[in-house]
Curated annotation (Swiss-Prot):
The record marks S73 as: Interaction with substrate tRNA. Catalyzes the transfer of a dimethylallyl group onto the adenine at position 37 in tRNAs that read codons beginning with uridine, leading to the formation of N6-(dimethylallyl)adenosine (i(6)A). Belongs to the IPP transferase family. Its cofactor is Mg(2+). Pfam families: IPPT. The gene is miaA. This is tRNA dimethylallyltransferase. It is an enzyme of class 2 (transferase). One of its GO terms (molecular function) is ATP binding. InterPro entries: Dimethylallyltransferase, IPT, P-loop_NTPase. Its EC number is 2.5.1.75. GO terms for biological process: tRNA modification. It catalyses: adenosine(37) in tRNA + dimethylallyl diphosphate = N(6)-dimethylallyladenosine(37) in tRNA + diphosphate. Monomer.
Amino acid sequence: MDAEIFSLDSLSIYKDINIASAKPSLKERKNIKHYALDYLNIDEKNNAQLFKTLLEDAMRVSSKEILLIVGGSSFYLKSILEGLSDTPKISGEEVVKIEREIATLSNPYIFLKSIDPNMAFKIHSNDTYRIHKALEIFYATHTPPSEYFKANPKKPFAHAISLFALSVEKNALHNNIKQRTKNMLHSGLIEEIKALYTQYPKDSQPFKAIGVKESILFLEKRLTLKELEETITSNTIKLAKRQNTFNKTQFNNLYTGSVKEVRHAILKHSKSGIKG
């Protein structure tokens, strides 16, 4: 398949996280152009808007007939396809100030409810990501988020994207995850995270990712090596299940099949001139 690859993975976008992200090696990338890898420093934030910008850039410069968007964050993909509102432009200093403000809140959801009941109604009380994003907008604009979004409506994604998902038998998937975890530990996962955790702020976004957060618990002597392996495996299996459910329920026209079937379907779609 003559294609280029766009990584929609919220961990592979970071420099220096190679083992925890199972990032393609430089050798693997040598003959195939990859986008959105090694783009951010550890203490920088990723979000759907950033991936949308990088994806549009990749689509503009890609010389191949097929651009495969792979990974990663189905939530980001859904956000990009449905459209994103322009976010407030704020300086690095303001970001730090806003983060401090939010960190002082004893119950961010209750506070959101008090300043914007309409927005709070749309967000589950456990959805910390969306609560945080809503509060960022409030502190940056001094406007209730629902009013901000009314004034800044979503802009639909301007390109046609075909959606494909790999179907893997449950036991095979679990065995793959177990082996992947073993390989990561054998390749130096703990050493990789130790070097980064001592160098960057403890609240950096990638430190919350599966594989990373458990390694930090091990470094803090809160998990044994055996527990580390078991916890990464268990959390990854749960994530795979959530992603599978999300993909099935949140995307229309999703083609699901084996590797061979998906490959055939992508090639068939590419002949009709669709990138994706």
